Amino acid sequence: MNAHSKILAYNSSVKFTNWREKLQTNFTNFIIDVKDVDMFGDKVGFIKAVVDLKIDGKKIPGITFIRGDSVSILTEIRTESYSYFVLVYQPRIPVGDFIYENPAGMMDESGDPAGVSIQEIEEETGIKIKKENWKFLDSVYTSPGFTDEVVHLYHVILNMTEYEVLKLNNRLTGTENELISLKVVNKKDYLRLNKTAIGLSSLYLAKV
């Protein structure tokens, strides 16, 4: 894709227009300089921008990584005797390590976080869920000094047998270019393994 096509793509993307409209609502007299755009095929992935903005004559740091909204799903499994949580274990290059986290994914252009949540659960765990099984917890910023990302948090409750839980544990999943394995854990191990702010926030908000 050439530079002109990229400009047309990011200018019309939901993530960029939403971010720009929010800036226009809350600030005046700013200039947006888009430095680079990462494309995922023909779709806009990430946008790196610098905003020239002053408030009362003081220049405000404006380096921004625009990635749009995401979803994260606290996946709880209940058997007759125990309660478990499903974590995904995968390499995360920005932190230089493999980490445990909740099933999650980026929003698409549909702007439907509930629909994306269901899709991500199926892709990352192989579990099919119904809307009545989950509830919305909250929407939170992840790193507002760097990125526009808002994560919509959901809590899903599934009923399974101990045998079904056993089959789910250590399952290899994920789509192309993903290397994901599942870990089914109790609450104590969830707190020990999941060191993401999103994971800990979800557990707190779900009050489980």
Residues of each region from the PLM?
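N-terminal leader/linker segments that precede catalytic domains of diphosphate-processing enzymes
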Residues: 1-99, 106-119, 127-177, 183, ...
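Phosphate/diphosphate-binding loops
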Residues: 123
